Amino acid sequence: MPEQNPLPFPDGQSAPPSPAGAETGATAAALPPAAPVALDAPAPAAPVLAPARVAKRPWWARLLGRLADPWLSLTIEPEQPGRYDDGKPVVYVLEDYGLSNALILDKACREAGLPSPLVPLPGDPLERKRAYLALSRRSSSNSLIPEQRGGKTHSDSLAKLLQAHRVRADLDVHLVPVSIFVGRAPDKQSGWFAVLFSENWALVGRFRRLLSVLLNGRTTIVRFAPPISLRQTMAEGLPPERTLRKLQRVLRTHFRRIREAVIGPDLSTRRLLVDQVLAADSVREAIATQAKRDNSKPVDAWRKAHAYAWEIAADYSSPVVRSASFLLTHVWNRIYAGVLVHHLDKLKQAAPGHEVVYVPSHRSHMDYLLLSYLLYERGIVPPHIVAGINLNLPVVGTLLRKGGAFFIRRSIRGNALYSAVLSEYVAQLVAGGYSIEYFVEGGRSRTGRLLQPKGGMIAMTLRAYLRQPRKPVLFQPVYIGYEKLMEGNSYLDELTGRPKEKESIWGLLWSIPKVLKQNYGQVVVNFGEPIALNDVLAKHAPEWNGEPLPDDEKPTWLAPAVDTLATQIQTRINCAADVNPINLLALALLSTPKHAMGEADLIAQIELCKKLLAEMPYSDRVTVTPHTPARIITHAEEINVLTRVSHPLGDVLSVSGDTAVLLSYFRNNVLHLFTASSWVACCFQNNRRMSRAGLLRLGRTVYPFLQAELFLPWSEDRFAERIEQTIDMFVREGLLLNVTDDDGGILARNTGQTDEVFRLRAIGHSLQQAFERYYIAISVLVKNGPGVLGAGELESLCQQAAQRLSLLYAPAAPEFFDKTLFRSFIQKLRELRLVWPDENSKLMFDERLDAWAKDAKFILGRELRHTIERVSPEAAKPDVVSPPAE
């Protein structure tokens, strides 16, 4: 198991220290903050301790020590503790009491040549016949997974030691804090039980501690801290009670920081977070309002708020996360041919000092598990994950909750109390420095495209930061790419009109054996370029001075900032795409009428796609499979995606039926990477010749709509440059010819059915249906006239026209009649003022829309345009009631 950091800090770089209290002085200085670095980094300077005491250890300690020795193997930090030669007595300080801790400490001292903690100091100032004390007592509970840490207790021994210093002026005991971690990160070979009983934040009972020592004692870490002089501490002149409280606080802060550095922050705080949420002013006001609205008692509204908070809150458990990691390793090895991670090192460079919000693409339920697993395996504490309430199933929901998931309802509109509780819970997570993960798309994509983002969680995160701007927030886009989806068949059913099946525990259990028998290929997780929230705020709110904003203040720049963040997240996810073998096969095979190609043609088409990606890189974070076209074909056959039909004139490779529909999902994953090349190729589908200037003009015209649909990163000028680069490459490849230099150059494609024409047509096919959708919307608008249709009516009529066109003309991909794509196109028309609403919310337009429609002849064939115009419906006319005859 790799070393785990509480946040993704680079090795050797410290997190910003948290304050230890208002007082300062020799005591605070004696315990420097523990930097969250990997455990193999240099440890703090060794305490130099007194020679071993002459008195023998108690007989029971010698007996139990011999019994425990075979089960213990210690890693002592620092490696070579020295000796303290001025004769000052030493008392060790542990975080909590326990026989196992005493025996481990005694063994560590013997191995390091230090004084035994089980032999009392001269005069026994502790009055306990020993030389160690602890700040807390273990809970007597022997539950295997306790939900809460036991309560802290007042250290009587420390009070007695301080009192002894007041009585004896010659006494100067040095306190040496010692942190003990049993099984901090056991090897996977140790077994599931070893992972379950490894070190965590809970104070556990004797039985659990015994199992922990037996299973994980051979991976025990003992860390000594520099000593504290009690005489110097008392020299500060504070009152006795205040000295005791300060010393205990500093020691607890030290132990907490060491524990955070070794096992990550304490995330098992469900009850604490719920209490903090319910105590917040905004929630208390919402409770009072709810009671008035329901005409009920305040306590009833409070109970409702408590139920909401308890339904939402995560219940992070380190043992469960470790156990899940152990189990998932075997699952991934069984169903996937590897999980690759790219650019995580860049996140580790950018993350120090930031609150990290992970915003991945969402294409499978596996996304939840994969990202958390990969972060944990690479030494980063998994984030708190926003999950839909539909996943809060019996047993499964509990496990997800203990893995860091918190559950939210799909719709919170009209429920002010729930909204207040959820907003406050997110605010508490952000203020507490916990990393968060959510899917801005809201749900899983059924088409393979990134969905239009929803800004609800982004707005909550932004408001939480503005309320308490402690640590700057970093949004981390993540692209997760699959070669085969577990949910493929259910997506297929939904896309053909069948209602989405409700998740159930029995459905999950029934699917497990089938899933484990499948080969789902390789998974790639790419980390995109992070987005600093402060950079977005600097653009949208330059007047904000960094001071906290009250909850009731709603600045006008908040909504535009949320929209910008949402679009940037989707754009940067696309900029970190991975192109896998199935993506390339889908691009090639779905461009043919029967979704089949000869093997030589398929190899040539894949080579062309890879060359386009190599010569015109989309971004420096896009990754492309290194496999050759021949190996790609073999791999697709291995995972049962591709069918080979032998033939004397050459083998034919094809996909058919449901597989072809599912392949459109993987084509859509990478459609944005080929936008410029597909645009140029589309223009030559129905045109033998075109001018370079005409290509650029039309490209600038259509680009805003492509940008909104595919989350493209370029300006219009930059897109025009990519069109120029694409043209030059097509000329070099022989796909286009420079005929004359008129009008910036006249370009022509080859005549006949040459290989070059075939490859050009295949490249252009992927964007063809997008332009058909655009023309459907324009045709429906023009046919009905200005001031007739509202935006919602236009969406419905466009969807009906697209469905009919698919039935009459040619089968289309499922997203062809997706209403949300029409909605996005209509919204972009409104933004560009090509259409606008009148006083009755009906869409108006002028002759510019007619000109836009005329340009369609350069892209769509005459027959297709005519068919679209014929199937474009008109809005139903209201019945005209004839006036009664006189």
Curated annotation (Swiss-Prot):
UniProt record similarity statement? Belongs to the GPAT/DAPAT family.
Could you tell me which residues belong to the region Disordered? 1-29
Q: Where is the composition biased (Low complexity)?
A: 20-29
Q: What is known of its domains?
A: The HXXXXD motif is essential for acyltransferase activity and may constitute the binding site for the phosphate moiety of the glycerol-3-phosphate.
Q: Name one GO biological process term.
A: fatty acid metabolic process
Q: In which pathway does it act?
A: Phospholipid metabolism; CDP-diacylglycerol biosynthesis; CDP-diacylglycerol from sn-glycerol 3-phosphate: step 1/3
This chain's protein is named Glycerol-3-phosphate acyltransferase
The organism named in the record is: Xanthomonas campestris pv. campestris (strain ATCC 33913 / DSM 3586 / NCPPB 528 / LMG 568 / P 25)
Task: Tell me which domain of life the UniProt entry assigns to the organism this sequence originates from.
Answer: Bacteria
Q: Which CDD domains match?
A: LPLAT_DHAPAT-like (cd07993)
